[in-house]
């Protein structure tokens, strides 16, 4: 009996050590030895580029990351009647400010539902769960400012390439690792830890934080909508 218990203990210790080594070595390789390359400048959407999501959002770039030297991004952010942002989410390091131009914006901010009318502004501080809706009968039009911008003008192109339905591992790579976008639940600390540990595994099986082919396809479509230049054209 004692021998069996000792054997089980040794197996449990061996498994635990293997898991720790796997995640530790994976993190070392992913973050330090072979880090993912940053998205190239051409992947940022240019001013005038416009796109729509399946849930009724329409975004048009006014000033992106490159135009403001990474200080902020400014976009026309509109939602069709009955439209919504797909899921409640958190940006731990970004502030979002929505100045409503026409219609009304309904937003779940933390545990509170707010209605912002034309002429009013909604400020979402960093780390605050939020989800905008349009429950009105007319289009909600606003100007949104994101500070700092991160890679928000790249994010939608990546999401579009995934048909707006990323898998769990892809979310760990795309949302959290690359674009500072966390689901509202569980807590960001939990999601951040999971993302840190699973990113190497996700990358090992083929997931990435940036897909050039998605960016090119998306920006060509946005250029056609806005009569803008080819995505690889220099600024």
Regions found by a protein language model. Give the residues of each.
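A cytosolic small-molecule/anion-sensing beta-strand core signal
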Residues: 101-102
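Structured binding elements
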Residues: 98
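Short, well-ordered beta-strand segments enriched in hydrophobic/aromatic residues
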Residues: 73-79
């Amino acid at each position: 009996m004692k021998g069996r218990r000792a054997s089980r203990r040794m197996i449990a210790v061996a498994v635990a050590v293997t898991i720790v080594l796997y995640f530790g070595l994976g993190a070392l390789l992913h973050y330090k030895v072979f880090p993912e390359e940053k998205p190239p400048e051409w992947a940022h959407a240019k001013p005038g580029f416009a796109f729509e999501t399946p849930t009724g959002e329409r975004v048009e770039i006014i000033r992106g990351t490159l135009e403001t030297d990474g200080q902020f991004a400014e976009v026309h952010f509109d939602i069709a009647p009955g439209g919504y942002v797909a899921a409640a989410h958190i940006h731990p390091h970004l502030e979002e400010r929505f100045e409503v131009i026409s219609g009304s914006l309904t937003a779940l901010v933390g545990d509170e539902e707010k209605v912002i009318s034309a002429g009013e502004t909604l400020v979402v501080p960093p780390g605050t769960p939020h989800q905008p809706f349009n429950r009105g009968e007319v289009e909600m039009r606003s100007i949104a400012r994101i500070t700092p911008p991160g890679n928000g003008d790249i994010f939608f192109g990546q999401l579009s390439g995934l048909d707006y339905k990323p898998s769990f591992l892809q979310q760990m790579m795309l949302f959290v690792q690359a674009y500072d976008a966390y689901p509202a639940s569980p807590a960001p600390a939990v999601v951040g830890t999971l993302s840190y540990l699973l990113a190497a595994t996700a990358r090992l099986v083929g997931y990435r934080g940036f897909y050039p082919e998605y960016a090119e396809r998306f920006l060509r479509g946005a250029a056609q909508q806005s009569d803008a230049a080819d995505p690889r054209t220099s600024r």
